[in-house]
Regions:
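Helix-turn-helix
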Residues: 10, 14-52, 56
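Helical hydrophobic small-molecule/effector-binding pocket
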Residues: 80-106, 122, 164, 168-171, ...
Length: 207
């Protein structure tokens, strides 16, 4: 007889595993219940709709991709280095999947798309805040340049959008990194400042 209760985090872990292996569009409450050996009703206790389950898997993706490696920042890390790390973490998380994550999301029905949008908003805002924190704390940045189109409020969403575009297209972000180096830092004899000016370490902070 199936177990009737299960920890919510374990449910999300199993759902994420199914989505990574078969695609998020293949995920269903019944499939999750069967994989966990529990009654379907036990899943509905935590996720009343498939859209709720899809949103939880989406949040799990960002949690795995970002929070452990990218959410803690320190004053010794340049903005461009942090952007590289962010792009690398997202790319690594996608590479671990057996399916095209973005193509799968496009196949979802409208109700699940709306749930994803609702879940994505706060996460993107959190990522933009992290980018702004690192940008403003980078002592090598020429801060007088952070105005107009290069203001943190405009630059960070642009950087994040470019990262996601590169992930969807399967391209690298080297042009973005080069533009950031040229736009934000003073050139020095052996390279741009972002690669040659060392900042004194500050206390670790959560973004």
């Amino acid at each position: 007889m199936p177990k009737q209760v299960i920890d919510k985090d374990k449910l999300v872990d199993q759902a994420y595993s199914i989505a990574a292996r078969e695609g998020i569009s293949a995920l269903s409450v019944r499939k999750l219940a069967a994989a966990c050996g529990i009654a379907v009703g036990s899943v509905y206790m935590y996720f009343p709709t498939k859209a709720d389950l899809t949103a939880a898997v989406f949040r799990r993706f960002f949690g795995q991709a970002l929070f452990e490696e990218c959410c803690r920042v320190d004053g010794s890390e340049s903005f461009v280095d942090y952007v590289r790390k962010l792009r690398g973490a997202l790319g690594e998380a996608l590479a671990q999947m057996d399916v095209d994550w973005f193509a799968e999301m496009r196949r979802l029905p409208r109700s699940e798309h709306e749930a994803l949008e609702a879940a994505r908003g706060p996460m993107l805002a959190h990522m933009e805040q992290g980018l702004q924190h690192v940008l403003e704390a980078d002592p090598a940045v020429v801060h007088s340049r952070l105005v107009g189109a290069l203001s943190p409020e405009k630059l960070c969403p642009f950087v994040l959008g470019t990262i996601f575009t590169s992930l969807m297209e399967g391209s690298d972000c080297e042009p973005l990194f080069a533009l950031l180096d040229a736009s934000l830092y003073e050139a020095v004899a052996d390279g741009v400042a972002s690669g040659s000016v060392a900042a004194a370490p500050d206390e670790m902070k959560d973004c």
